[in-house]
Amino acid sequence: MHARIRRHAIAAATLAVTIGLMSLANPSAYAGDTELNVYNWSEYIAKDTVPNFQKLTGIHVRYDSYDSDDTLQTKLLAGSSGYDIVVPTSNFMARQIQAGVYQKLDKSKIPNLANLDPVLMSKIADADPGNQYGVPWAWGTDGIGYNIQAIKKRLGDNAPVDSWALLFDPENLAKLKGCGVSFLDAPDDAFSAALQYMGRDPNSSNPGDYHAAFEVLKKIRPYITQFNSTAYADDLANNDVCIALGWSGDVGVARRRTQDAGKSYEIRFVNPKEGGLLWFDVMAVPKDAAHAEAAMQWINYIEDPKVNAAITNEIFYPTANKPARAFVTPGIAHDPNVYIPDDVMNRMTLAKPRTAEISRLENRLWLQLKSGG
């Protein structure tokens, strides 16, 4: 599956003790690199992206993948990641920048930065002021993936499919347990969604809001059949679950798979009317990168519109590259759940870093919820 298994909240205090230490590392000198080490989310790239880069540049690429921001962050904070390109989520990158784990981009070597949408770049600047460290890989939203036929069968034609109530109203979820209810194993996504259902700030720094969200989650806990951030799209496509808290592109892939397989049911993704989280995954160069020159070449290559579009066509996540959209398959380019319209974008909230206090609280409550509430 195209899993960009995103955010398991990590205590922000871990980053706090690291701030300033990483700045002692020296950036690599740019000098005729012949290799590049890339660390990205699993199944988050087109099949020919790496081979074509190698043919174009003669640079050998070692391409590894991870399945959570925690995994990446652990490597970065250790001080010797061994990678030249990493792809953190923007709210994680914000604290990592403070910790000094990245080197500034040499924008003179990345002319394709001119292709980036200034509106989206201004949103990323909330985490990366001046866009000095990160270049967008892809972006997406948190929402609900569901099996249309299964939901109608159990909830009727008037099911609130445009609302978080579909997932957080215990009366609804009790009727859906029999066909499978999946939640991302990602506390910040789950708590943010619950907060939006309640009409509260999904980036709240008020502990009381998280305790209130926990009470909402406790009421539906008996009906959640799995916590899964890796296989839920496959489960939706295979009719093993009928509803999921998920990420837009993953559900898009599930929808395509059911269509390609000629299934009798249809998968749909919705950005709820109450709002949802908006997030960006960005390419960044670690402070200790051994091949910074090759890293700049890679970033410039990825921001070529045709290269960029090929990635979107594979993973169902849009990018901030404006010219690339002309090369995206029409069915994807005009899908409002991929390139969301302005009225939907206006109700999205950019995911922001949790404070150390909230991160600890959220983790504790999440473990309690998973163990039975």
Feature map (PLM): residue ranges:
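Ligand-binding "clamshell"
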Residues: 97-105, 122-124, 128-131, 223, ...
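Short beta-strand->loop
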Residues: 103-114, 165, 261-277, 286-288
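Mature extracytoplasmic/periplasmic domains
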Residues: 286-347
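Conserved C-terminal helix/tail region of periplasmic/extracytoplasmic solute-binding proteins
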Residues: 234, 342-373
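A structural signal for short loop-to-beta-strand junctions that line the ligand-binding cleft
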Residues: 81-85, 103-108, 112-149
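Early extracytoplasmic/lumenal segment of secretory-pathway proteins
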Residues: 30-96
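A bilobed periplasmic-binding-protein/Venus flytrap-type ligand-binding module shared by bacterial periplasmic
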Residues: 145-150, 196-199, 279-291, 310
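Ligand-binding pocket segment of bilobal, Venus flytrap-like solute-binding proteins
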Residues: 179-194, 198-270
